[in-house]
């Protein structure tokens, strides 16, 4: 049921979407040891910095921080980020291959967004990060 909800919705053109702001987010890990692991909701925020649109997961022990880029498909964005842990300094994509994260981002409604991480380095075969606007 949780996975069906996270994967529901029809992607919309991302350039019509304002992702900036505070979100609640959670990760669903699929495959490897267990068929699915659903983590609780944590805080995330998206904002513009001097470089681009940026995402930070600000709660939980496993966090991500990175940037969004345009894709040839108008209904998705590319996310390049890096995994870091609660007490670690934020990392940038490309600094440590084992921590690099790549995902496609999909705008589903005014208050819903999803990142899909194919073949993450740790713990699963695919991660889905679900966002709901606070």
Regions found by a protein language model. Name each.
Residues 1-18:
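Amphipathic/hydrophobic helical signal segments and adjacent flexible N-terminal regions
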Residues 2-5, 94-104, 110-134:
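Edge beta-strand at a domain terminus
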Residues 11-13, 35, 74, 120:
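Proline-rich intrinsically disordered, low-complexity coils
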Residues 16-20, 47-50, 68-77, 105-112, ...:
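A short, structured loop/turn motif at beta-sheet edges
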Residues 20, 41-43, 102, 128:
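Extracellular structured ligand-interaction cores
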Residues 25-100:
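Central antiparallel beta-sheet cores of small beta-barrel/beta-sandwich binding domains
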């Amino acid at each position: 049921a949780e996975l069906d909800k996270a994967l529901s919705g029809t992607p919309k053109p991302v350039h019509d979407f304002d992702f900036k702001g505070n979100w609640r987010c959670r990760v669903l890990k699929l495959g490897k040891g267990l068929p699915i692991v659903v983590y609780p909701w944590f805080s995330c925020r998206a904002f513009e910095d001097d470089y681009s649109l940026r995402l930070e997961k600000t709660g939980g022990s496993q966090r991500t921080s990175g940037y969004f880029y345009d894709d040839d498909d108008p209904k998705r964005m590319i996310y390049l980020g890096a995994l870091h842990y609660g007490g670690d300094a934020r990392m940038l994509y490309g600094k440590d291959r084992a921590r690099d994260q790549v995902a496609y981002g999909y705008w589903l409604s005014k208050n819903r967004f999803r990142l899909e991480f194919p073949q993450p380095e740790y713990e699963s075969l695919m991660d889905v990060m679900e966002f709901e606007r606070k």
